[in-house]
Amino acid sequence: MLRKKYSVIILAAGQGKRMLSSIPKVMHKIAGRSMLQHLIDSVSKINIQSIYIVYNESLREFIPTIYSNKCTISIYWVLQESVRGTGYAVQQVLSMIHDDNEDILILYGDVPLISDKTLNNLCLMKSKCDIGLLTAYVKNPQGYGRIIRNQYGDVVSIIEDIDIVNQNDRIIKEIHSGIFISVSGYLKSWLNYLIENNLWCNELYLTAIIDIAYKNNFVINAIHPVDVCEVIGINNKSDLVKAERVYQIKEAQKLLELGVMISDLNRFDLRGKLVCGEDVCIDVNVIIEGCVSLGNRVKIGASCILKDVEIGDDVIIYPFSFIENSKIHCKSKIGPFARLRPGTCLQEQVHIGNFVELKNIKLGNNSKVGHLSYLGDADVGNYVNIGAGTIICNYNGKTKNYTCIEDNVFVGADSQLVAPITIGKNAVIGAGTTVTQNVDKDDVIISRVRQFSIVNDKVDKNKKN
């Protein structure tokens, strides 16, 4: 664990024109979180005290959505005064930092996959040098700044991709991720030198300080990330999609190593936190959002969506089911094509069939809702059977009303239960019944037009009434 506290500068003021979107680039999402949030979550795991985020005006409306999981970390938002390059952006923040001995970790908002392990390694290296760079070897370095080393292997400068004129420099495979660490006093001095000596063109590149530091005998070291994929830079939606898949495959691989059976690493999406018991099986195209807990021997069918769900042991979720903010106890079976909306709680061995929608409801042990039904705002007891096509009419146009169905009730197909209403134990509701009044226990209720037939050979069956 790092003992010294660091401050972090996140450069997030880029225009992101290549994203072709009205949404600021750093607010585009990977695994359900913005790129900026990914960075904040990573740096919050190391020993930092402050985060300075340099942003442009288009990001202002998104500021309330950004947070740190650690209350001890302060986040400062710094509006970029003018688009004059990364050097000026950092200098703007440095004017707010009065301790010239403070170590500053600089990150880029469009490099979101950096891990806390890599950042921790970079910070630890800082004790042995004046500048610590995060570099990587990549197959295709196009678009990245290249690391220039001398014959002894020392880093002497960084040349931006746009400024490369020498073919030998162009084929260099070691790239600068944009991420580095140094001391605030040094950064101030180097940037002031560049400005005072007019050693810049239209924009002041932060990377220009490396050449100055080397020529003044400062020690520059470089390390590589734990995984080269961490330094993927995102400039357009194609990059975003690639980064998403890289992230998801890594998360799926972690789950496999923990014993979870993921049918296809390329067809699994984790957009939150997943906790699993033993022998859990997850089929293809499953999406996990929010906080999801799966008990032992749970099976999730293809194309299911689970959002903020707690599922007990031996539960089977059949394909194409959507479950959110719900709790399902052990040995229950759900779906296919079931929808469980917020507030649903299923006790043990409950069966929910295809095309059933539940909302704000509790179903007791061994109760069944077979198919084609809607139940909302209700408390259903144990061993209740709800026939196909049953609807709880819980909304009168102004307010939602509550329904109570006690133990061992049988509700026939195509019934309507008009809330507020209570149905007593062991009652039977005949098929096609509309129930508008409370039903006592053991009662049998039928309310429908009696069937009758018309015998008339002269009736033209093809005539329209």
Curated annotation (Swiss-Prot):
<dbReference type="GO" id="GO:0008360">
    <property type="term" value="P:regulation of cell shape"/>
</dbReference>
<dbReference type="GO" id="GO:0000902">
    <property type="term" value="P:cell morphogenesis"/>
</dbReference>
<comment type="similarity">
    <text>In the C-terminal section; belongs to the transferase hexapeptide repeat family.</text>
</comment>
<dbReference type="InterPro" id="IPR050065">
    <property type="entry name" value="GlmU-like"/>
</dbReference>
<feature type="binding site">
    <location>
        <position position="385"/>
    </location>
    <ligand>
        <name>UDP-N-acetyl-alpha-D-glucosamine</name>
    </ligand>
</feature>
<keyword id="KW-0573">Peptidoglycan synthesis</keyword>
<dbReference type="GO" id="GO:0000287">
    <property type="term" value="F:magnesium ion binding"/>
</dbReference>
<feature type="binding site">
    <location>
        <position position="235"/>
    </location>
    <ligand>
        <name>Mg(2+)</name>
    </ligand>
</feature>
<feature type="binding site">
    <location>
        <position position="80"/>
    </location>
    <ligand>
        <name>UDP-N-acetyl-alpha-D-glucosamine</name>
    </ligand>
</feature>
<keyword id="KW-0548">Nucleotidyltransferase</keyword>
<feature type="binding site">
    <location>
        <position position="160"/>
    </location>
    <ligand>
        <name>UDP-N-acetyl-alpha-D-glucosamine</name>
    </ligand>
</feature>
<protein>
    <recommendedName>
        <fullName>Bifunctional protein GlmU</fullName>
        <ecNumber>2.7.7.23</ecNumber>
        <ecNumber>2.3.1.157</ecNumber>
    </recommendedName>
</protein>
<comment type="subunit">
    <text>Homotrimer.</text>
</comment>
<feature type="active site" description="Proton acceptor">
    <location>
        <position position="371"/>
    </location>
</feature>
<dbReference type="GO" id="GO:0003977">
    <property type="term" value="F:UDP-N-acetylglucosamine diphosphorylase activity"/>
</dbReference>
<keyword id="KW-0012">Acyltransferase</keyword>
<dbReference type="InterPro" id="IPR011004">
    <property type="entry name" value="Trimer_LpxA-like_sf"/>
</dbReference>
<keyword id="KW-0511">Multifunctional enzyme</keyword>
<dbReference type="InterPro" id="IPR001451">
    <property type="entry name" value="Hexapep"/>
</dbReference>
<keyword id="KW-0677">Repeat</keyword>
<feature type="binding site">
    <location>
        <position position="388"/>
    </location>
    <ligand>
        <name>acetyl-CoA</name>
    </ligand>
</feature>
<dbReference type="GO" id="GO:0009252">
    <property type="term" value="P:peptidoglycan biosynthetic process"/>
</dbReference>
<feature type="binding site">
    <location>
        <position position="359"/>
    </location>
    <ligand>
        <name>UDP-N-acetyl-alpha-D-glucosamine</name>
    </ligand>
</feature>
<feature type="binding site">
    <location>
        <position position="374"/>
    </location>
    <ligand>
        <name>UDP-N-acetyl-alpha-D-glucosamine</name>
    </ligand>
</feature>
<dbReference type="GO" id="GO:0016020">
    <property type="term" value="C:membrane"/>
</dbReference>
<dbReference type="GO" id="GO:0006048">
    <property type="term" value="P:UDP-N-acetylglucosamine biosynthetic process"/>
</dbReference>
<keyword id="KW-0479">Metal-binding</keyword>
<keyword id="KW-0963">Cytoplasm</keyword>
<keyword id="KW-0961">Cell wall biogenesis/degradation</keyword>
<feature type="binding site">
    <location>
        <position position="341"/>
    </location>
    <ligand>
        <name>UDP-N-acetyl-alpha-D-glucosamine</name>
    </ligand>
</feature>
<feature type="binding site">
    <location>
        <begin position="394"/>
        <end position="395"/>
    </location>
    <ligand>
        <name>acetyl-CoA</name>
    </ligand>
</feature>
<feature type="binding site">
    <location>
        <position position="145"/>
    </location>
    <ligand>
        <name>UDP-N-acetyl-alpha-D-glucosamine</name>
    </ligand>
</feature>
<keyword id="KW-0133">Cell shape</keyword>
<dbReference type="GO" id="GO:0071555">
    <property type="term" value="P:cell wall organization"/>
</dbReference>
<dbReference type="GO" id="GO:0019134">
    <property type="term" value="F:glucosamine-1-phosphate N-acetyltransferase activity"/>
</dbReference>
<dbReference type="InterPro" id="IPR018357">
    <property type="entry name" value="Hexapep_transf_CS"/>
</dbReference>
<dbReference type="InterPro" id="IPR025877">
    <property type="entry name" value="MobA-like_NTP_Trfase"/>
</dbReference>
<feature type="region of interest" description="Pyrophosphorylase">
    <location>
        <begin position="1"/>
        <end position="237"/>
    </location>
</feature>
<dbReference type="GO" id="GO:0005737">
    <property type="term" value="C:cytoplasm"/>
</dbReference>
<feature type="binding site">
    <location>
        <position position="25"/>
    </location>
    <ligand>
        <name>UDP-N-acetyl-alpha-D-glucosamine</name>
    </ligand>
</feature>
<feature type="binding site">
    <location>
        <position position="448"/>
    </location>
    <ligand>
        <name>acetyl-CoA</name>
    </ligand>
</feature>
<dbReference type="InterPro" id="IPR005882">
    <property type="entry name" value="Bifunctional_GlmU"/>
</dbReference>
